[in-house]
């Protein structure tokens, strides 16, 4: 069998069609496949003529009429996106300095923002009621939180051992020895720091407690006068004039999972009969060449299998500006004005057609809503860690989400995905300028979702949480270390966002959102400092002689005190604030039925195990978050390169590398406290022993085998596992199917496989006009690539080749026409483990 015969056999043609092709040489095959009989001055350009034929034979059901077009040079191009109709989307510069704004106002240079006159008087009057109610509620929350914090802080002050606060007079210490003065002041300085940190942390815990409590009451009553979901009955026909884009920004994601969830979502939309109102946009920022090719292939298969021609689009950006927010902005500039709304999906998002249609109905019923955020439920993971987190978010999450809605109403959160956005105001007001200055807190905004919600609200549009709308799902990280990688990004992003706290026009609620975003991570170093100061105070108490007399003519000594009964009472009160929301959550399930959670005893046992698990993980997260916060402030780059693994489990080596310092700190802390005062070790035991056990908990909780065992025992069971919704059943089915036909080593297949090469050539975006300089550059790229082994061809050079239709055609021709000359490429390709199902194309995979 010669090379030409081998090439013909690799084509997805019938035996009769293969027999009709010439067997003389590769060029003749491409000329025979070219229905237009084009001639090329260069022999290695001949594959460009057969692109259309190779595509049509490989994916006959994926190509809509008119989707294959000609570029300016007459080359076949697969039009993966609709025609762009550009909109202007530009950001207002951030004015973060109130002093500078005041000075500009004095000089008559104050700039009136674009958002000032958005609402008419009639619109303001129609919304005044819920805004007034929201303001009153938030004042009540503030009073409750501060009152509770003041009482607890005063109580904390009374149980500290050194009570000579009133006797300290700095003037009396002027003439005495510096060391004596320092030793007199040291316990009180430590206690002052402890009190300040306690007040801040208790206030943070108190706010969460009142949020969960109000959420519990909302869900228990079952009626919410101000719920945005109450504005529709749920079966109104959608307005055909208002079309919705489902956009999914992705970047080097699991291709099988992305397209499985997307297919299940789209089929659910079709089942509602509302598919004509929606289009899908896959917006790729992937820069791994193998994943890029796999995405293109998966897109073609998806279109064929759901008949999505002309409604499901794919685009890969060559210039990845501003990450996810820049990807969404690019969509809005090019295609946004073709749609009234857009729903942003994450790579792991799954949404039912009823949920998506419901979000559109809510938008149409509330013309002043800018963003409506659904409440996604976590599901789909099998590791012990993920199942425990799924259970926690499913049981406790509804309380906190309903509580957030109770306090915030139409001035709420946006979490960046599983939400519907009104496109026009988003384009006009939500473009993000880079933060001014230099350093780690300047430049492109990382956590864009909170900022976009704040800008939407600043422009007068409502931001709502539809906390009671079912059908929205997501996945959680499979293990602790993967969650911490995500937290590292979120930590930096939330710290950056706090620079916008004083920006002009921001609503007070969204200033509070910026503050709570910071506290989500800043609370970790504050808690660590609180523990460190408490330990230092115990060291001072144990190793130094107390200063009984703090004034020169003091008549009675000040005795250090230890009142364990009061300390236990305060500790118990704090634990109530921390754990009562969990108890309220389980009580709500007890009231409404425990069957979907495994029954009364199993859900109760699951709750107790989750509490134990959260106690073990809290100190570990505290130390990691402390490192993230300190690194962000110091401008350090936290490098976190995990080894490649075949499943979600954490290897023992990586666990000890990540948690080794925590284990050592826990051991030193425990031994030191046991030597000083065994009673104090009792108070620190949940902290230090959690740190000592951290590597073991991290590894064991990452195992799918352990998680699946708890699933068989019906522990950590959630309703989505007990009675899976159809959209999740379909996601699992399509995920299994996609993994059977997964395409690995996509770039090499795009060079060698005729069908995938035609797809890569047709979808390449670097379509320049012909020029001598360009031809020289193309020849250089191709020659340099082929003269090296494929293993030495780095990612960036592969991307350059993949982006140019001419270079891909020439690579394809040369490796097939002269396999002896390019034996390193041929041998490497033949050494790959090929998945036959991945190379069968639409003609076989659809059967």
From Swiss-Prot:
Concerning CDD domains, the annotation shows:
Glucan_BSP_MdoH
Q: Which residues lie on this side of the membrane: Cytoplasmic?
A: 1-138, 217-511, 591-602, 703-847
According to its UniProt entry, the function of this protein is described as:
Involved in the biosynthesis of osmoregulated periplasmic glucans (OPGs).
Source species of the chain: Salmonella typhimurium (strain LT2 / SGSC1412 / ATCC 700720)
**What family is it from?**
Belongs to the glycosyltransferase 2 family. OpgH subfamily.
Q: Which InterPro entries match?
A: Glucans_biosynth_gluTrFase_H, Glyco_trans_2-like, Glycosyltr_2/OpgH_subfam, Nucleotide-diphossugar_trans
Give the transmembrane region(s): 139-156, 194-216, 512-534, 568-590, 603-625, 680-702
Give its E.C. classification number: 2.4.1.-
Name of the protein in question: Glucans biosynthesis glucosyltransferase H
Q: Which PANTHER family match?
A: CELLULOSE SYNTHASE CATALYTIC SUBUNIT A [UDP-FORMING], GLUCANS BIOSYNTHESIS GLUCOSYLTRANSFERASE H
Q: Which GO terms describe its biological process?
A: glucan biosynthetic process
Its principal location? membrane
For whether the record's keyword set contains Signal, the answer is no
């Amino acid at each position: 069998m010669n090379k030409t015969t081998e090439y013909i056999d690799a084509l997805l043609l019938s035996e009769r069609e293969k027999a009709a092709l010439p067997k003389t040489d590769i060029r003749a095959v491409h000329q025979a496949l070219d229905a237009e009989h084009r001639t090329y001055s260069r022999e290695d350009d001949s594959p460009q003529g057969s692109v259309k034929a190779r595509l049509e034979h490989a994916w006959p059901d994926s190509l809509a009429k008119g989707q294959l077009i000609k570029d300016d040079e007459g080359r076949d191009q697969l039009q993966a996106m609709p025609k762009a109709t550009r909109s202007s989307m530009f950001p207002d510069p951030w004015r973060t300095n109130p002093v500078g704004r005041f000075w500009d106002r004095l000089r008559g240079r104050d700039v009136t923002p674009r958002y000032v006159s958005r609402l008419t008087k009639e619109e303001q009057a129609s919304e005044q009621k819920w805004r007034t109610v929201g303001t009153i509620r938030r004042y009540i929350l503030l009073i409750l939180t501060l009152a509770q914090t003041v009482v607890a802080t005063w109580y904390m002050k009374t149980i500290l051992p050194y009570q000579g606060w009133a006797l300290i007079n700095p003037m009396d210490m002027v003439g005495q020895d510096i060391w004596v003065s320092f030793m007199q002041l040291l316990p009180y300085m430590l206690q002052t720091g402890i009190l300040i940190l306690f007040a801040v942390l208790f206030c943070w815990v108190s706010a969460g407690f009142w949020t969960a409590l109000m959420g519990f009451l909302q869900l228990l009553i079952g009626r919410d006068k101000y719920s945005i979901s109450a504005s529709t009955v749920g079966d109104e026909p959608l307005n055909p004039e208002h079309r919705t884009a489902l956009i999914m920004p992705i970047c080097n994601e699991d291709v099988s999972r992305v397209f499985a969830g997307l297919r299940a979502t789209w089929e659910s939309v079709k089942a509602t009969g509302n598919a004509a109102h929606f289009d899908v946009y896959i917006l790729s920022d992937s820069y791994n060449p193998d994943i890029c090719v796999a995405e293109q292939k998966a897109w073609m298969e998806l279109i064929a299998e759901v008949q999505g021609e002309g409604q499901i689009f794919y685009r890969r950006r060559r210039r990845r500006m501003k990450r996810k927010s820049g990807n969404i902005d690019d969509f809005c500039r090019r295609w946004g004005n073709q749609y009234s709304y857009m729903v942003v999906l994450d790579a792991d998002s799954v949404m039912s057609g009823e949920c998506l249609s419901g979000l559109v109905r809510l938008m149409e019923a509330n013309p002043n809503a800018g963003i409506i955020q659904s409440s996604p439920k976590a599901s789909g993971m099998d590791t012990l860690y993920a199942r425990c987190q799924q259970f926690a978010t499913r049981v406790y999450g509804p309380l906190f989400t309903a509580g957030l809605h109770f306090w915030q109403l139409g001035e709420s959160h946006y979490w960046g995905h599983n939400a519907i956005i009104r496109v026009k105001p988003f384009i006009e007001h939500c473009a993000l300028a880079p933060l001014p200055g230099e350093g780690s807190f300047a430049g492109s905004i990382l956590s864009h979702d909170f900022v976009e919600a704040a800008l939407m609200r600043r422009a007068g549009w409502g931001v709502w949480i539809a906390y009671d709308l079912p059908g929205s799902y997501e996945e959680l990280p499979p293990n602790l270390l993967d969650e911490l990688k995500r937290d590292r990004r979120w930590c930096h992003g939330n710290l950056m966002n706090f620079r916008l706290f004083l920006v002009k026009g921001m609503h007070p609620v969204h200033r509070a959102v910026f503050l709570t975003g910071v506290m989500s991570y800043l609370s970790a170093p504050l808690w660590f400092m609180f523990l460190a100061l408490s330990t230092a105070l115990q060291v001072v108490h144990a190793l130094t002689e107390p200063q009984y007399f703090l004034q020169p003519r003091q008549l009675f000594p000040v005795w250090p005190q230890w009142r364990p009964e009061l300390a236990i009472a305060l500790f118990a009160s704090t634990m109530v604030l921390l754990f009562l929301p969990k108890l309220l959550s389980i009580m709500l399930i007890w009231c409404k039925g425990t069957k979907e959670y495994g029954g009364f005893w199993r859900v109760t046992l699951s709750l107790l195990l989750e509490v134990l698990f959260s106690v073990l993980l809290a100190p570990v997260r505290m130390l990691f978050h402390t490192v993230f916060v300190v690194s962000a402030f110091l401008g350090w780059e936290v490098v976190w390169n995990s080894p490649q693994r075949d499943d979600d489990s954490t290897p023992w080596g990586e666990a000890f590398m990540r948690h080794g310092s925590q284990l050592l700190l826990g051991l030193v802390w425990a031994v030191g406290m046991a030597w000083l005062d065994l009673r104090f070790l009792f108070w620190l035991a949940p902290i230090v022993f959690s740190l000592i056990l951290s590597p073991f908990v991290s590894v064991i909780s990452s195992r799918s085998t352990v998680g699946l065992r708890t699933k068989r025992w019906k522990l950590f069971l959630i309703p989505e596992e007990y009675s899976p919704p159809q959209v999740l059943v379909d996601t699992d089915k399509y995920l299994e199917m996609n993994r059977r036909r997964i395409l690995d080593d996509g770039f090499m297949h795009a060079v060698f496989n005729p069908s995938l090469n035609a797809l890569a050539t047709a979808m390449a975006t670097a379509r320049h006009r012909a020029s001598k300089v360009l031809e020289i550059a193309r020849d250089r790229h191709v020659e340099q690539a082929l003269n090296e082994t494929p293993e030495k061809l780095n990612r960036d050079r592969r991307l350059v080749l993949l982006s140019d239709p001419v270079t891909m055609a020439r690579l394809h021709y040369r490796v097939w026409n002269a396999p002896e000359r390019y034996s390193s490429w041929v041998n490497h390709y033949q050494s790959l483990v090929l998945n036959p199902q991945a190379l069968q194309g639409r003609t076989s995979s659809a059967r």
